[in-house]
Amino acid sequence: MPGVQDRVIVVTGAGGGLGREYALTLAGEGASVVVNDLGGARDGTGAGSAMADEVVAEIRDKGGRAVANYDSVATEDGAANIIKTALDEFGAVHGVVSNAGILRDGTFHKMSFENWDAVLKVHLYGGYHVLRAAWPHFREQSYGRVVVATSTSGLFGNFGQTNYGAAKLGLVGLINTLALEGAKYNIHANALAPIAATRMTQDILPPEVLEKLTPEFVAPVVAYLCTEECADNASVYVVGGGKVQRVALFGNDGANFDKPPSVQDVAARWAEITDLSGAKIAGFKL
């Protein structure tokens, strides 16, 4: 199958960890890769070119095609330049893996607006900026593949990560609508929540767990989602440690009221409303 052969894929946050592995895997499968990384610290401070350059050199040493980009996804101009790098170097852009991210953890009681805003700017706004810059090219060529990095912190919650969880679940809302708007243009958008040992998780999970969670388990799934053959759209996957699973929202049959209910009416049927024993994949309609 063609896979990603001769496709141009942008990977943001590709200077290390999961992003690096995504870039290496895609290049190994024949894609031309834009290796974007600001080169900063885990909390988003600082910048540098070494991280992206090293990944590009590694790809080229193996006979692959790659170019480095050091712009920030958190600004419209930076994102536009990331896509421009793909167009200038390879003449097209066929896919985006929105992976760039930072961490500024803290309980909600102590969450400053600065730390809330910084995380949303990179994860959620960063996803918007880069995809918005690529979108006209996807539409024009009637082809595009989008993979955003969500997180179990957004899907299920995680103590001390209100900013991160909100941003990551926001990306799921983004791909749900991109999938609808892009379908007629053969643009598919999916989300993947990776569980892997990287600098983002090195002090969150115990060492005996981290050693089983290498990025190599995750990257092939990301690469497959970038292929033309993958027909999935608006789907969310949790991947790590050898397990690949789809997750989705579920809904039950609920309760129907013929007239506006009282609080007591709602309370009387609350068990029926909340019972998920017969739940099915959710979609809302009256």
Swiss-Prot record:
GO terms for molecular function: 3-hydroxyacyl-CoA dehydrogenase activity; enoyl-CoA hydratase activity. It holds the Pfam family adh_short. GO terms for cellular component: peptidoglycan-based cell wall; plasma membrane. CDD domains: hydroxyacyl-CoA-like_DH_SDR_c-like (cd05353). GO terms for biological process: fatty acid beta-oxidation; protein pupylation. It is an enzyme of class 1 (oxidoreductase). Gene3D superfamilies: NAD(P)-binding Rossmann-like Domain. Keywords: Isopeptide bond, Oxidoreductase, Ubl conjugation. There is a cross-link at K280 (Isoglutamyl lysine isopeptide (Lys-Gln) (interchain with Q-Cter in protein Pup)). PANTHER family: DEHYDROGENASES, SHORT CHAIN, SCP2 DOMAIN-CONTAINING PROTEIN. This is Putative short-chain type dehydrogenase/reductase Rv0148.
